[in-house]
UniProtKB/Swiss-Prot annotation:
The keyword Lyase does not apply. It comes from the Eukaryota. The keyword Phosphoprotein applies. This is Uncharacterized protein YNL208W. Keywords: Acetylation, Mitochondrion, Phosphoprotein. InterPro entries: Gly_zipper_2TM_dom (IPR008816). It is found in: Mitochondrion. Residues 124-163, 170-179, 186-199 have a biased composition (Gly residues). It comes from Saccharomyces cerevisiae (strain ATCC 204508 / S288c) (Baker's yeast). Residues 22-31 have a biased composition (Polar residues). Its main location: mitochondrion.
Length: 199
């Protein structure tokens, strides 16, 4: 059981030490919950070890003089990359569990329950008629309107969250809510800010 699962489950066990004697054969009574069916910690350690060793091998092969420094740097880079890949796979797996939890309809427009995750389906919520504009805050990417599939229409409503990729929070006014892919917010007349500027 990971630390996150442990603390979010509300099942913080109790530690009962009895004169440093180990109880054998006694039932566990749920005090030390071992989650043998879900060895995520072992998988993370395994991916770190494999990534580190692959990085060390690649680092030593890239270097002409086979220095230890290039091997160590390769190991660190490989372990880091392996952990990033592992995290992305966990996010993708978690996202598939909640894949189609999109709600929509006027007057709020669509609402996508994913917060900055990429599931590559076009299930953005349906929006109502185009809102009165306002300002949207996004990072980089093309401007567009949210909505399902290629129609890409925004809807009215207050502030809310967009779908995955570079969408950010909606600003004041009646912006519609975007779906997945690089769609951004906007109201009437494609108002919304996408550039690299920040507020």
């Amino acid at each position: 059981m990971s630390a996150n699962e442990f603390y979010s489950s509300g099942q913080q066990g109790q530690y009962n030490q009895q004169n440093n004697q180990e109880r054998t054969g006694a039932p566990n009574n749920g005090q030390y919950g071992a989650d043998n069916g879900n060895p995520n910690g072992e998988r993370g350690l395994f991916s770190t070890i494999v990534g580190g060793s692959a990085g060390a091998y690649a680092g030593s092969k890239v270097s002409n003089n086979h220095s230890k420094l290039s091997g160590v740097l390769g190991a660190i880079g490989g372990a880091f990359l392996a952990n990033k890949i592992s995290d992305e796979r966990k996010e993708h797996k978690q996202q598939e569990q909640y894949g189609n939890s999109n709600f929509g309809g006027a007057p709020q427009g669509g609402h996508n329950n994913h917060h900055r995750q990429d599931n590559n389906n076009n299930n953005g919520g349906f929006g109502g008629p185009g809102g009165p504009g306002g300002q949207g805050f996004g990072r980089q990417g093309p401007q567009g309107f949210g909505g399902p599939g290629p129609q890409e229409f925004g809807g009215p409503g207050g502030q809310g969250f967009g779908g995955p990729n570079p969408q950010e929070f909606g600003g004041p006014g009646g912006q519609g809510f975007g779906g997945p892919n690089p769609q951004e917010f906007g109201g009437q007349g494609r108002q919304g800010f996408n550039g690299g500027s920040r507020w």
